[in-house]
Amino acid sequence: MVAHSSEGLSATAPVTGGDVLVDARASLEEKEAPRDVNANTKQATTEEPRIQLPTVDAFRRAIPAHCFERDLVKSIRYLVQDFAALTILYFALPAFEYFGLFGYLVWNIFMGVFGFALFVVGHDCLHGSFSDNQNLNDFIGHIAFSPLFSPYFPWQKSHKLHHAFTNHIDKDHGHVWIQDKDWEAMPSWKRWFNPIPFSGWLKWFPVYTLFGFCDGSHFWPYSSLFVRNSERVQCVISGICCCVCAYIALTIAGSYSNWFWYYWVPLSFFGLMLVIVTYLQHVDDVAEVYEADEWSFVRGQTQTIDRYYGLGLDTTMHHITDGHVAHHFFNKIPHYHLIEATEGVKKVLEPLSDTQYGYKSQVNYDFFARFLWFNYKLDYLVHKTAGIMQFRTTLEEKAKAK
């Protein structure tokens, strides 16, 4: 049984840095009485022990206050640092190409890593953790996102929904959670295509932003992602910025061939890093996904996984890999405070270390192989109990181990 603290989630607590959707959800949870998450269980054979989930306020108290402070100078330094790294890589391109196709591949990998690092700085902007001025955040966010052909305002909208409803089976649109019923309804070609190791890369970038499989196109102002006219205007503004950057790249390249090989291909490697990192932050054998009656903000965030990639990648990508759990509880914490904030989160979750809701962290030097393997293995979700889902293969392995 999982019960929420009698405090509930304070409606005034900075659940995700002031996101309206989460504040509203928190207000509802404040009224909830403790409940048995295994009520009406379909498959459970034993009753789980009673577990008291911490409140958001408990996490906030455990994190040093200065972790919530934004330093504009430091934020700009990281922005300049990432642009400088990408510029240096372009100047160093002839040295890489000296080694032929292998050198070109290595160059693209570096471009993908540093492109994703720039994306993380823009990601701070859309959360409001770049500076105290949201207008400045939005301006800088476009500077960071547009060269990456990532429309800033639409990303801001869809990403806030992901944070507000993490691991909610219906409302978390950051990932397409495929259920058994979805799998059965799929055409055979799609069931064949999904397990292909690189299918995640092919599906999510740039097809995801262009066509929007689960939450609507990020470029089309009349897609299902946008409700208000102001959002549609923002979509157009961000889309124009992306197209302007792509045109500037074409002008500099001098030909469509050069534009493809030296702008679009490295852009696709950025997309690969984006897919790998975001996928592994939330997809794992142990992760649970919840239906509406079983979901809560804290419960969903505890399924997030910190992964240490090593080789300097975590520092280069601003610790969005190994500080992601803290980021999900408080997304207004700047990336340069995430590791310190993580220590506070770990202390709060320590009493739950032997449960499904403990702090989840892995050292994954094999992150690329793990991404490919999970994309093949973790095909669809089935009910673990009523309202609680896990991947089919996870439950089958548990059943065989008994």
Curated annotation (Swiss-Prot):
GO terms for cellular component: membrane. Pathway: Lipid metabolism; polyunsaturated fatty acid biosynthesis. Its EC number is 1.14.19.-. GO terms for molecular function: oxidoreductase activity. Its main location: membrane. The chain crosses the membrane at residues 79-99, 101-121, 235-255, 260-280. It catalyses: (9Z,12Z)-octadecadienoyl-CoA + 2 Fe(II)-[cytochrome b5] + O2 + 2 H(+) = (9Z,12Z,15Z)-octadecatrienoyl-CoA + 2 Fe(III)-[cytochrome b5] + 2 H2O; (8Z,11Z,14Z)-eicosatrienoyl-CoA + 2 Fe(II)-[cytochrome b5] + O2 + 2 H(+) = (8Z,11Z,14Z,17Z)-eicosatetraenoyl-CoA + 2 Fe(III)-[cytochrome b5] + 2 H2O; (5Z,8Z,11Z,14Z)-eicosatetraenoyl-CoA + 2 Fe(II)-[cytochrome b5] + O2 + 2 H(+) = (5Z,8Z,11Z,14Z,17Z)-eicosapentaenoyl-CoA + 2 Fe(III)-[cytochrome b5] + 2 H2O; (7Z,10Z,13Z,16Z)-docosatetraenoyl-CoA + 2 Fe(II)-[cytochrome b5] + O2 + 2 H(+) = (7Z,10Z,13Z,16Z,19Z)-docosapentaenoyl-CoA + 2 Fe(III)-[cytochrome b5] + 2 H2O. It is found in: Membrane. Keywords: Fatty acid biosynthesis, Fatty acid metabolism, Lipid biosynthesis, Lipid metabolism, Membrane, Oxidoreductase, Transmembrane, Transmembrane helix. InterPro entries: FA_desaturase_dom, Fatty_acid_desaturase. It is a multi-pass membrane protein. Disruption phenotype: The fat-1 mutant displays a reduction in the n-3 PUFAs, the homozygous strain is incapable of producing the normal levels of C18 or C20 PUFAs. It is an enzyme of class 1 (oxidoreductase). GO terms for biological process: positive regulation of locomotion; unsaturated fatty acid biosynthetic process. HPO-19 and T05H4.4 are cytochrome b5 reductases required for PUFA desaturation in Caenorhabditis elegans. HPO-19 knockdown or mutation alters FAT-1 desaturase activity. Although FAT-1 lacks a cytochrome b5 domain, its N-terminal contains a DUF3474 domain that may possess some oxidoreductase activity for electron transfer, obviating the need for an extra cytochrome b5 enzyme, but still requiring cytochrome b5 reductase HPO-19/T05H4.4 to become activated. Belongs to the fatty acid desaturase type 1 family. Omega-3 fatty acid desaturase that recognizes a range of 18- and 20-carbon omega-6 substrates. Introduces a double bond in the fatty acid chain three carbons away from terminal methyl group to biosynthesize n-3 (omega-3) polyunsaturated fatty acids (PUFAs) endogenously (PUFAs are essential for membrane structure and many cellular and physiological processes). This is Omega-3 fatty acid desaturase fat-1. The lineage of its organism: Eukaryota, Metazoa, Ecdysozoa, Nematoda, Chromadorea. The gene is fat-1.
